[in-house]
Every structure is written in C-alpha cells, then in structure tokens.
C-alpha cells in the first residue's frame, strides 16, 4: 500500500464536500402483491435522479437482510428527505429509509 503522510491527509480533508447517504430498508408492506411493479418504478425514478446529477451512486443490496439499498446523494438532508418521501416505494410502504449527512471526495467513483 501507498504510505500516506499526515500532511497529505490534512490537504485532502480540505477537498471534501457534503453529501447524504441513504439507507433503504424493507418497509411494512415489503410483501405486498404489487411490490415488483412498485420497485420497478422506484428504479426508474433512481435513473431519473442519476441523470439529474442528484443521485451520485446507487447500490441495491440483495443479501436477504433488511437493508435494500444504499444511495449517495448530492443534496442536503432536507432535499433528500423530500426526494425520498416522494419515492413510489416509500409511499407504498415497500421501503423505509434513513438519511445521514456525510462528507466525501468529489470525483470519487466506483471502479469500472
């Protein structure tokens, strides 16, 4: 591994910016008959949010746990809460969510 100096760390920390992390979990209506259709529309909305530059990273979680997904938003906590409240999966009770303020490095991405 590359050795990272204290000076480098201090410099890099000045380059962070605020983001929000959303933890999406199974809601009370997870087993609803219309679940697949609603999740499909939830996914469509995620693509729209990605195209708008608001949802920077979206990661569905499929390990059988209550966690359904993780998203990193380029927006404030209040903006993200409003976005999530309008999500079709949240409105149908398929999902519930938590929003957490965070910081990260602009330009970071998932490897190809």
What are these model-predicted stretches?
Residues 1-112:
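Conserved, structured core segments of small domains
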